[in-house]
Amino acid sequence: MENYNTKPLSIVLASAFYDEQIKQGEKIAKELGIDKIALGKLIIDYLGRLCSSLIKDIGVDRLSGVFLSGGDTALAIVKHLGFETLEVVGEIEPGLPLLKVANTELKFATKAGGFGDEWTLIRVLYRLIS
């Protein structure tokens, strides 16, 4: 495995990329007696722990930014990182704020689902690395 501490990188983590994966997860949860709300909370908490662990391992000072889609997931990641406040420092596009962690240069962009176009992610990445 390559050492990601020595190379620039982009990492994408998602709970599911396709609708079929969501349905499969819901089916397994139902078989285990877990309802959709509890399943969602488990996934959000797990992603929060995983992302915060990865960010800490890479080093906050080595990252130019973090893009988070989904408000609950973003909140879980920020909580697990132990950050108290995020400051709004700009807007990438309507409804998509650019945030900065107090006392660091780390930037976050958070996007709720259901809006944006095929260029939204490109604009986000550009703002995070610039």
Residues covered by each model-derived region:
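Active-site catalytic microenvironments in core metabolic enzymes, especially phosphate/sugar-handling
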Residues: M1-S130
